[in-house]
Design a protein with these regions (language model features):
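Internal hydrophobic scaffold segments of catalytic domains
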Residues: 1-21, 116-149
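Predominantly a Rossmann-like dinucleotide-binding segment in NAD(P)-dependent oxidoreductases
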Residues: 1-85, 139, 231
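Glycine-rich, aromatic-lined ligand/substrate-binding cores of catalytic
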Residues: 55-128, 133-137
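A general structural signal for well-ordered alpha-helical segments in protein cores
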Residues: 59-60, 185-190, 221
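C-terminal glycine/acidic-rich active-site capping loop/insertion
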Residues: 65, 73, 92-97, 126-208
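Short arginine-rich
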Residues: 220-230
Length: 235
C-alpha cells in the first residue's frame, strides 16, 4: 500500500479512512478478574485515554505510515458507552493531513461482535486501495475505469514492489501477517544495529518504528482528548 501511494499509482491522495472496531469491552469486564481489561480502563495505569490510547494510536500510525503524510490537526468526539467506565471506549476523529489530505478515524471497543477488524482505505485522483487486518495477505487496488485488482502477498509474486517483497516470507497462498510483521520489525532493527556497528549505510527498504512514532502517538492521544473536551480543532 505504501509503495503504491509513494509511486503515484493512484494519483495525488485526497482522502483516507481507517477504522478499528473491537467488541471485547462491550460489558464491564474490568469489574471481574480480566487483567487486560482492568489496566486498560484504569487512568492511573493507562493514562488519560482508553480506546484511543489502546488502538487509536495504531490507527493513526497506519494513516501516517501508509500515506507518508503527517496529521497536522484533528477534531474528535470520544464516548463512554458502558456505565461506570472511567475512560472512553469509543470515538471518532476528523483528520487533516499534509498536502490537503482529509481523513476519518474510528475506533471502538464496544462494537459488539467484532474481533479485531482494523481496515484502511485511501483514495487518490486516479484510484484507491483497501486493506484489512483480518485478511492481511490481500490488498485491493481500485483504479479509475478499471476492474478492481486483488494483489496478494508472496515472495513469488513478481508484480509486488521491492519493498513488499522484502517483507514477504512465504510463497503465495501461505498465510502470513500479524506474527510475521513483528518479525520483520525485529529483523529490520537488527539490520540497522549491524550496519551501524559496521559503518554501513542503512537500506531504507528495511524500516521500523522509532521513538518519533511513539512521540507522535502520545501527541495524538493528547490532541484527541483535548479536542473532545473543548469541542474544537487541535493542531
Amino acid at each position: 500500500a505504501r509503495s503504491i501511494i509513494s509511486e503515484g499509482k493512484i494519483g495525488k491522495i485526497r482522502k483516507v479512512a481507517v477504522e478499528y472496531p473491537q467488541g471485547w469491552l462491550s460489558t464491564m469486564l474490568e469489574k471481574g478478574d480480566n487483567k487486560q481489561a482492568s489496566w486498560r480502563t484504569d487512568p492511573s495505569k493507562s493514562g488519560k485515554a482508553g480506546s484511543m490510547g489502546d488502538i487509536g494510536t495504531h490507527a493513526a500510525n497506519m494513516v501516517e505510515y501508509v500515506t507518508g503524510k503527517k496529521i497536522i490537526k484533528l477534531f474528535s468526539k470520544v464516548n463512554v458507552f458502558v456505565d461506570g467506565r472511567m475512560l472512553e471506549d469509543d470515538g471518532n476523529v476528523l483528520l487533516s493531513l499534509e498536502d490537503n489530505i482529509e481523513g476519518n478515524l474510528m475506533t471502538s471497543q464496544i462494537a459488539t461482535g467484532e474481533e479485531n477488524d482494523l481496515k484502511v482505505r485511501v483514495w487518490g485522483e486516479g484510484g484507491g486501495i483497501e486493506w484489512k487486518h483480518s485478511d492481511p495477505n490481500s490488498l485491493i487496488l481500485k483504479l479509475s475505469n478499471s476492474p478492481n485488482q486483488l494483489l496478494r502477498a508472496g515472495v513469488d509474486n513478481s508484480y509486488l514492489s521491492d519493498f513488499a517483497l522484502a517483507h514477504c516470507r512465504t510463497p503465495s497462498g501461505h498465510p502470513e501477517g500479524f506474527i510475521e510483521a513483528f518479525a520483520n520489525i525485529y529483523r529490520n532493527f537488527a539490520f540497522s544495529v549491524s550496519n551501524y556497528r559496521n559503518n554501513k549505510k542503512n537500506d531504507t527498504i528495511y524500516d521500523y518504528p522509532t521513538v518519533q512514532e511513539g512521540y507522535r502517538g502520545m501527541k495524538f492521544i493528547d490532541a484527541v482528548i483535548e479536542s473532545s473536551e473543548k469541542c474544537k480543532w487541535i493542531k
